[in-house]
Amino acid sequence: VAITTDQGMEDVARLINNVSPNAAYTYIATGSASTAESATQTSLGAENTQYGGQRQAATCEYEVPFKSKWEILLSFNGPVSIREIGLFNNSSAGRMFMRHVYDETMSKVSGQNLKITIYYTMVRV
């Protein structure tokens, strides 16, 4: 399960009452760090920057009921290790809405593809 960061929580609160909302979160980044998720994090531990593993604009959708969906298809042209993903509001730097660390590292090589889909579901508690 991913963690919503403090930046993400702040931006949702700003968006719903239109008080200085930040840019939409439309970019998915991958990285290789295994540091546990924390609400105070503002970036990935070790973001991938080459060979097809770098940050990409996502296809964004709304699904009923109450789900936001982001999806990218990565096509690798060299070796990439993926252990973490994050959702950002800019193609470089920017604010991080959420971060997830996988249990194990995925090792990808040239010629392989990987589809990443992120869902964010609003729930009542």
Where are each of the predicted segments found?
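Small cysteine-rich, disulfide-bonded extracellular modules of the LU/uPAR three-finger superfamily
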Residues: 1-83, 89-125
